[in-house]
Amino acid sequence: MSTGTVVQVIGAVVDVEFPHDAVPQVYDALEIKSEGLVLEVQQQLGGGVVRTIAMGSSDGLRRGLEVVNSGSPITVPVGEKTLGRIMNVLGEPVDEAGPIGEEDRYVIHREAPSYEDQSSSTELLETGIKVIDLVCPFAKGGKVGLFGGAGVGKTVNMMELINNIAKAHSGLSVFAGVGERTREGNDFYYEMEDSGVLDKVAMVYGQMNEPPGNRLRVALTGLTMAEKFRDEGKDVLFFVDNIYRYTLAGTEVSALLGRMPSAVGYQPTLAEEMGVLQERITSTKTGSITSVQAVYVPADDLTDPSPATTFAHLDATVVLSRNIASLGIYPAVDPLDSTSRQLDPQVVGQEHYDVATGVQTQLQRYKELKDIIAILGMDELSDDDKTTVFRARKIEKYLSQPFFVAEVFTGSPGKYVSLKDTIRGFKGILDGEFDHLPEQAFYMVGSIDEAVEKANKK
């Protein structure tokens, strides 16, 4: 273990000088013992000097402080002992419940599984959320992105997915809070505790008040813990909230290191950094990682380089729309924009595929007719078009659903709808079985039977 001294501090960037024959490698973890601060080597500048990024606050650092090279990248605890615990980027507990007591530690920079070891599955993962199960079904061991601007419900949707899948799936989950609000991490902890699944969830947080180096690495810390469970032959759920903050942290680090920015000010290595993370989130012949990632969309622009780069890695995309949220329809999932590789007759079956495409066709036709209705009114439409509009409005309302995690806000009990009931309900609307019911009966209900019951009460 070689030692060096701090020679320059500029915000989160710390330059350290080492003897010429003991210069640390890129990604090695260095520790300033007196400050309890860990640094990660990013560049070798020559002359024995390395440029590092601080994993914590660099307040109070000064030139001349002694720095010790650990000789390896950052290592974090893995295995059963991490379940039910909240940790930071270094795997240190922050829940005041004593040491982790881990039996093993892994380095956070690891190779992705080789092509021969990878395994893909077409087995569907039922979420209990109608709109997702119908138009963008998830695959076990797949990667899902929840795309949306500010305040359209990404975190609430993710909490509901965790609530529904973690309970029904009864597997292990790892939650990486990347650059999000501390309040959300707090809410998530108590939500898991109330649901009784806390002992099956490992939580890693790097909130938005942390330095950029911390936020850039916290996703890798969470992923390393998920990889350990996968390598033990388990099926694990890996939740990331929010992948955009990971990109943003990379942008900040890139600027601090003096790299030339690329489009919209992002780092020139955006695609590579995203690839390094996403390629590791994969299923092998031993076990599976099913990943759900929230993706913030800046200014609701899906062509922004950050969400656009993320798109390429996903199996299913759930796009949350501000227009749908403004109609009071929650979850505000856009059924015309959301996609899934699993929506194929050979995977989901012919009936599911026909109902899903039928729903999308009706909604697309309604979207086209909206301009005519706005200018000329409903009376100018043909009888067929009028029927399309009435059914599309019912479908639109029926795509809403009360959530378990939103019970405190809405006052309505949450509903879990099985895939079979979802298909039956939408098939009935498309076939005209419920043409006699008012469209309001379909709003914020679970199964179609509840809509019929609601209409009969009136």
Swiss-Prot record:
InterPro entries referenced in this protein's UniProt entry, alphabetically: AAA+_ATPase, ATP-synt_VA_C, ATP_synth_F1_bsu, ATPase_a/bsu_AS, ATPase_alpha/beta_chains, ATPase_F1/V1/A1_a/bsu_N, ATPase_F1/V1/A1_a/bsu_N_sf, ATPase_F1/V1/A1_a/bsu_nucl-bd
EC number: 7.1.2.2
Main location group: membrane
Catalyses which reaction(s): ATP + H2O + 4 H(+)(in) = ADP + phosphate + 5 H(+)(out)
Entry keyword annotation includes Nucleotide-binding: yes
Family matches, as Gene3D superfamilies: 2.40.10.170, Bovine Mitochondrial F1-atpase, Atp Synthase Beta Chain, Chain D, domain 3, P-loop containing nucleotide triphosphate hydrolases
Database matches in PROSITE patterns: ATPASE_ALPHA_BETA
GO molecular function: ATP binding; ATP hydrolysis activity; proton-transporting ATP synthase activity, rotational mechanism
HAMAP family reported for this sequence: ATP_synth_beta_bact (MF_01347)
PANTHER family recorded: ATP SYNTHASE (PTHR15184), ATP SYNTHASE SUBUNIT BETA, MITOCHONDRIAL (PTHR15184:SF71)
Subunit description: F-type ATPases have 2 components, CF(1) - the catalytic core - and CF(0) - the membrane proton channel. CF(1) has five subunits: alpha(3), beta(3), gamma(1), delta(1), epsilon(1). CF(0) has three main subunits: a(1), b(2) and c(9-12). The alpha and beta chains form an alternating ring which encloses part of the gamma chain. CF(1) is attached to CF(0) by a central stalk formed by the gamma and epsilon chains, while a peripheral stalk is formed by the delta and b chains.
Protein name in the entry: ATP synthase subunit beta
